């Protein structure tokens, strides 16, 4: 392929790290011996960067073996913006070891070692890893490959690894990488297996992209919700409850504002609210399928010699609530909303602040409808999601449509109807979307909504999921116009996703400086001296009467110190400076977060202004 690319242009040959031959990825060393459609993969393209990242994982493994030859290498996939590789070392790696490994990687890059692919029969591959390489992990991987299949390897100098490819032509292509951290990881993610060491790294096609990403990561570190959550007194985490965050009074204000807003907007949109039990009998989870497919993530308990499970999802309870009463087609659509607390067991190593927890509140809604109502209901949900994401928070977002997977329940006809309804709703609204072929759940297609935060990261939050499974399992019906029983179409949807996770995203998006309507403390009243305190307290009383969340700082500290604390530490949206002039003129001196400018308003004018500033506005 290299010679073909070179025949077109030298620059194409230099920039290509692979090619597609009739849609199949191949290395640049591939010899084309038949007529085919060929497309070269540019190193700077998303697919090209994935090839670079894959090859950088191999580069790191080679460097590790040069430095620590008794280490066993296991697997090393590509992840977003980089890669990782799991190792079984004789002694645990430290952060200092990462510097040595990275330096060795750079030496190997300078050697510009060629990557060569070859294949062995499955049994010979097992023999190689068992007898020559003496690597039980690779033996296990190869044993999972069907009998009779060929197993592909890549060799780069003194290093050989099991791999399907595709890879860069030589190590000289790998010039922009940075090792990030080392962490524990169980072999194949199973806690019954040995704990390995996972080294994470970033990798890009060029140094400029790497530097840009590292700058973003530096900014992300400043915005870390765990750090800001502690500084802003929003929440804390305790060793007595890993994965179970404690919300403090200020954090509860943020949480309750989001929840109250959610409830009001759903009531306006025609939703009825539910509350279903947090713990339900094992039999229910057997009917829903969770007991067989999700058992290891569920918390259980025995009551009166019966086995119960704390709910990991709200859906079965929502189905029971709908099924509890007889429904006519005239009652549909039935929009049932629930802010339900769910519990899911996550491995301790996967827990991350509010982003990955064991207990969280999901803003679920389940809509039961007739087939001819599906598209209109989807349009209604998309508009509601847009109202929150775009008009309230000002988020840009992307939509992905995931279609029927190979293994699925339901007829092709109902899948076609459901996918057409999802796509048709988006087309009708003029929304762009990406299709993920075969990535839907086995029980129905879905739309995923991914919001973009202030530093360009994408977060999957909202989902619209059609479900053919639960109505069938629970035998859910309604009485149609013909007087007969019919199966309703069920739709699951979330907007926030998890309240806790969404708060974590907002903390990082706003870097802790919430918009005024959401801030735990909206106004801080700062006095210059003791003579101003009575006037400041009058203002505080009026703000409380107006429903404004305000605090008074009448400590015997300098005004500069008070401003730095209110502005820099607590990120209060509005600060009022009260001195002699303000008392005499019946006015306030206003300073907004992040600004050094100050301006004055008479009291009556200020009260109108502050109420308007603190009002929730869907107008972004």
From Swiss-Prot:
EC number(s) per entry: 6.1.1.3
Cofactor binding note from Swiss-Prot or TrEMBL: Binds 1 zinc ion per subunit.
Signal peptide: none
Superkingdom of this protein's organism: Bacteria
InterPro entries given in the database record: aa-tRNA-synt_IIb, aa-tRNA-synth_II, aa-tRNA-synth_II/BPL/LPL, Anticodon-bd, Anticodon-bd_dom_sf, Beta-grasp_dom_sf, TGS, TGS-like
Localisation per UniProt entry: Cytoplasm
Reaction(s) catalysed (UniProt annotation): tRNA(Thr) + L-threonine + ATP = L-threonyl-tRNA(Thr) + AMP + diphosphate + H(+)
Any one Gene Ontology cellular component term annotated for this protein: cytoplasm
UniProtKB keywords: Aminoacyl-tRNA synthetase, ATP-binding, Cytoplasm, Ligase, Metal-binding, Nucleotide-binding, Protein biosynthesis, RNA-binding, tRNA-binding, Zinc
Quaternary state and interactors: Homodimer.
Family classification: Belongs to the class-II aminoacyl-tRNA synthetase family.
Record protein name field: Threonine--tRNA ligase
Gene expressing this chain: thrS
């Amino acid at each position: 392929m290299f010679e073909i690319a070179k025949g077109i242009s030298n620059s194409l040959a230099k920039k290509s790290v692979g090619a597609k031959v009739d849609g199949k990825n191949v290395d640049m060393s591939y010899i084309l011996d038949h007529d085919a459609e060929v497309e070269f993969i540019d190193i700077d393209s998303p697919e090209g960067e994935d090839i670079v990242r894959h090859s950088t994982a191999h580069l790191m493994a080679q460097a590790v073996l040069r430095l620590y030859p008794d280490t066993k290498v296991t697997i090393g996939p590509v992840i977003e913006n980089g890669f990782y590789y799991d190792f079984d070392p004789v002694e645990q790696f430290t952060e200092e070891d990462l510097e040595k490994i990275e330096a060795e990687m750079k030496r190997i890059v300078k050697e510009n070692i060629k990557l060569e692919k070859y294949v062995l029969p499955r049994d010979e591959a097992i023999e190689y890893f068992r007898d020559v390489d003496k690597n039980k992990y690779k033996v296990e991987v190869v044993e999972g490959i069907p009998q009779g299949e060929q197993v592909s390897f890549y060799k780069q100098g003194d290093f050989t690894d099991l791999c399907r490819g595709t890879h860069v032509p030589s190590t000289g292509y790998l010039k922009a990488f940075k090792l990030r951290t080392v962490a524990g990881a169980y072999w194949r993610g199973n806690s019954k297996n040995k704990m390995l060491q996972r080294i994470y790294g970033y990798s890009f096609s060029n140094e400029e992209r790497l530097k840009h990403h590292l700058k973003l990561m530096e900014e992300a570190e400043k915005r870390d919700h765990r750090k800001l959550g502690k500084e802003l007194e929003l929440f804390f985490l305790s060793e007595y409850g890993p994965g179970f965050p404690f919300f403090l009074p200020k954090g509860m204000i943020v949480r309750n504002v989001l929840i109250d807003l959610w409830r009001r907007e759903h009531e306006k949109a025609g939703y009825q609210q539910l509350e279903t039990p947090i713990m339900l009998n094992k039999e229910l989870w057997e009917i829903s399928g969770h007991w067989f497919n999700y058992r290891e993530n569920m918390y259980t308990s025995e009551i009166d010699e019966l086995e119960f499970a704390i709910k990991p999802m709200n859906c079965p309870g929502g189905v029971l609530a709908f099924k509890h009463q007889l429904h006519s087609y005239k009652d549909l659509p039935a929009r049932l909303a629930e802010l339900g607390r769910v519990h899911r067991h996550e491995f301790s190593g996967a827990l991350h602040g509010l982003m990955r927890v064991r207990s969280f509140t999901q803003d679920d809604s389940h809509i039961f409808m007739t087939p001819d109502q599906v598209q209109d209901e989807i349009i209604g949900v998309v508009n509601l999601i847009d109202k929150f994401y775009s008009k309230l928070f000002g988020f840009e977002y992307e939509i992905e449509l995931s279609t029927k997977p190979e293994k699925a329940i339901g007829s092709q006809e109902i899948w076609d109807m459901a996918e057409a309804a999802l796509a048709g709703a988006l087309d009708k609204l003029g929304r762009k979307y990406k299709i993920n072929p075969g990535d839907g759940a086995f029980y129905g297609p879905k739309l995923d909504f991914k919001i973009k935060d202030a530093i360009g990261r994408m977060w999957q939050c909202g989902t619209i999921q059609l479900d053919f499974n639960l109505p069938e399992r629970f035998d859910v019906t309604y009485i149609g116009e013909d007087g007969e029983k019919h199966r309703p179409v069920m739709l699951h949807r979330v907007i926030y996703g998890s309240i806790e996770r969404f708060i974590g995203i907002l903390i990082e998006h706003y870097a802790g400086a919430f918009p005024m309507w959401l801030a735990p403390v909206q106004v801080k009243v700062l006095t210059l001296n003791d003579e101003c305190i009575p006037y400041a307290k009058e203002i505080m009383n009026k703000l409380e009467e107006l429903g404004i969340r305000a605090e008074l700082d009448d400590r015997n500290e300098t005004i500069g110190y008070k401003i730095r604390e209110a502005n820099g530490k607590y990120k209060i949206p509005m600060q009022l400076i009260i001195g002699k002039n303000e008392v005499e003129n019946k006015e306030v001196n206003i300073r907004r977060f992040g600004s050094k400018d100050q301006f004055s308003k008479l009291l009556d004018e200020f009260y109108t202004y502050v109420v308007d500033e603190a009002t929730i506005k869907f107008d972004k």
